[in-house]
Design a protein with these regions (language model features):
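Extreme N-terminal starter segment of soluble prokaryotic enzymes
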Residues: 1-5
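Structural signal for terminal/edge beta-strands and the immediately following C-terminal loop/tail
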Residues: 297-334
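Conserved beta-strand termini and adjacent loop/short-helix elements that scaffold enzyme active sites
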Residues: 29-32, 116-118, 264-266, 307
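Conserved mixed alpha/beta catalytic, RNA-binding, or beta-rich assembly cores of soluble enzyme
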Residues: 8, 12-18, 25, 34-36, ...
């Protein structure tokens, strides 16, 4: 987690520096050294995982207000008074990790963590915090409140999962009799009205003709996801043959999605384990019978999930890394 601290007094700056020594991050003093709060907040909101204000909560609230978008995208925001008495998570308590960060910071300076989320206050299962701990994206953040609301009202909720979840489900959480009856689902193929939690375990294998533009790749990718009902939030990186390393369109496409790329030689691709769609034409051009499937499997160190799909000179495939979800969702669980 990349942290950014800002303080407004000498005492607050000393506390920020103490906190940064334990939870590393940059430290700035508002109003000094040319640091303007509005500029600092805008920059850090875009590039940091967490913003820590040492000062009045009102200052922090006014500073972040223009930048808040959604609980799925906003960074964690925590405020501490300059005396280090209280640590208050203001934004992204679960998905952004602000609640946990506030507790860590409080432990450093012996402050009281002031956690205001209802599920935490009552010890109720927090589906969004569980999603974060299982490295899942939340496809529909607006649906979190229905799951949490039911649990807070003393009702049970049902889940479906495409993987076995080890351990015992929390109180009030039961397996659904059928997938379409689930209140939340752990899946890469979201359907229906449930809250879908998307494991971030997928690798996109890519093959393309020389000179393929980012726009063409984007169009193909959208069609690929639509045809397979696949959740793009599950992809964490992309992979291809080293012949494509200098393709500007491919680089721009991956950059737009925030994916790093892995490139493999033909010899390395031939070592991939599994059954793959073979093409004599691809073999004659690249030296290996399949690029997208083999590259995805190698990068994921896993298994093929969606086989080769082709359109307009673009081939795509998806492989999955190993995934072993469990029911742990709190810091104090073993």
């Amino acid at each position: 987690m990349t942290c950014a601290y800002i303080a407004f007094t000498a005492r607050g700056l000393a506390l920020a520096q103490q906190l940064a020594a334990a939870c590393p991050g940059s430290v700035a003093r508002g109003g000094a050294d040319g640091v303007r709060l509005t500029d600092w907040t805008a920059a850090q909101f875009a590039q940091s995982d967490a913003l820590i204000f040492v000062g009045a909560a009102g200052i922090a609230v006014r500073a972040i207000a223009p930048h808040c978008r959604s609980k799925a995208a906003d960074p964690a925001v925590v405020v501490l008074d300059e005396g280090g008495r209280f640590a208050i998570p203001l934004l992204s308590g679960h998905l952004g990790g602000a609640n946990e960060l506030a507790q860590r910071l409080a432990a450093v300076c012996h402050a009281v963590p002031v956690i205001t989320t209802a599920t935490d206050g009552r010890g109720v299962f927090a589906v969004d915090e569980w999603a974060k701990r299982q490295n899942c994206a939340v496809a529909e953040p607006e649906r979190i409140r229905y799951v949490s609301g039911a649990l807070l009202a003393g009702q049970s909720v049902c889940y479906a999962a495409d993987w076995a979840v080890s351990g015992t489900p929390p109180a009030g959480v039961e397996p659904a009799a059928a997938a379409d009856r689930a209140d939340f689902a752990l899946t890469l193929i979201p359907t229906g009205e449930a809250l879908h939690l998307i494991p971030r375990i997928a690798v996109l294998g890519v093959g393309c003709k020389r000179g393929t533009t980012a726009e063409r790749l984007e169009t193909a990718f959208a069609a690929f996801c639509a045809e397979h009902h696949f959740a793009p939030q599950g992809i964490v990186r992309a992979a291809s043959i080293d012949l494509k390393k200098n393709e500007p369109g491919l680089a721009a496409f991956c950059r737009a999605h925030g994916w790093k790329m892995d490139f493999y030689t033909a010899a390395a691709l031939r070592t991939a384990k599994g059954r793959f769609t073979s093409s004599g034409f691809v073999q004659s051009i690249t030296g290996v019978d399949n690029v997208c499937e083999r590259a995805a499997v190698l990068a994921a160190d896993g298994v093929l999930f969606i086989p080769k799909w082709a359109r307009d000179g673009v081939t795509l495939a998806v492989a999955l890394a190993p995934f072993a979800p469990d029911w742990r969702w709190k810091n104090d669980e073993p």
